[in-house]
Amino acid sequence: MNKPAKWIVRHRDKAPTVPCPCGSSTRILTRADGQSVVNLHVTHIQDSRLHYHKKCNEVYYILEGAGTMELDGKKVELTPGTVVYIPAGTRHRGCGDFKTVVVGTPAIEENDEYFD
C-alpha cells in the first residue's frame, strides 16, 4: 500500500477520466492516492448498470442533467441539487443522462462492485 497522504490537492482538470459501468468517471481522489477514507469522482452517468457495493457507502450530488436513480427497485427523480445517500448493499443504478459528484466511504476498492 502507498504511504498515507498528509494532504492532497488536485484540480479536476488534472485527474484521469476513465470509462466505468455508469458512463465515464473523473477520478479526483482515490485509494491510489495513499488514503482509504474517501473517494471523490465526477461521473457522467448514461443509463448505468444495476450494481451494488459490499463495503462502500456512496453519496451522489447531481450537478447537471436529469434522470432517475433506482434504489433497491424504487425509482426517485434526479435534478441538479439533489443529494442521494446509498448505503453499502443497496442495488442501484442511474437512468438518464446527468453529471454527479460521487463520494464513497470508505474509498471504494476495485473489486467492490457487484452485478447480479
Protein language model features and the residues they cover:
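His/acidic/aromatic-lined binding-pocket segments of jelly-roll/cupin-type domains
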Residues: 50-52, 57-62, 76, 92
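A cytosolic small-molecule/anion-sensing beta-strand core signal
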Residues: 41, 63-64, 79-80, 96
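Short strand-coil-strand connectors
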Residues: 70-74, 97
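Ligand-binding loop in jelly-roll beta-barrel domains
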Residues: 88-113
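Short, conserved beta-strand element in jelly-roll/cupin
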Residues: 42-45, 54-69
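A short glycine-rich, His/Asp/Glu-containing loop-to-beta-strand
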Residues: 14-50, 103, 112-114
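Extreme N-terminal tail/first-helix region
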Residues: 2-20
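Short acidic-glycine-tyrosine-enriched beta hairpin
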Residues: 73-89
